[in-house]
Swiss-Prot record:
Function: During stationary phase, converts 70S ribosomes to an inactive dimeric form (100S ribosomes).
Compartmental location: Cytoplasm
Keywords, ordered alphabetically: Cytoplasm, Translation regulation
Cystine connections: none
UniProt xrefs under Pfam families: RMF
Main location class: cytoplasm
Name of this protein: Ribosome modulation factor
Length: 68
């Protein structure tokens, strides 16, 4: 059975979350405008917050799988 691709907004959120957790700058957002950029930035903000709150790698992986 074929798996459906996730929509672009959830993929952008996940990528933004990963960037935030890794401590990268939000200026590295690959999207220029629109809903996809907002999703990436929202993920980035949540990732930075989790990074600051001291989530370990396992907790971050669990959070990403719960979001997706």
């Amino acid at each position: 059975m074929k798996r459906q691709k996730r929509d672009h907004t959830s993929r952008a959120f996940t990528r933004g979350y990963q960037a935030g957790v890794e401590g990268r700058s939000r200026s590295l957002c690959p999207h220029s405008t629109g809903e996809i950029k907002q999703s990436w930035l929202t993920g980035w903000r949540e990732g930075r917050e989790d990074h600051w709150n001291g989530f370990n790698t396992l907790a971050q992986v669990q959070r990403i799988s719960n979001i997706s």
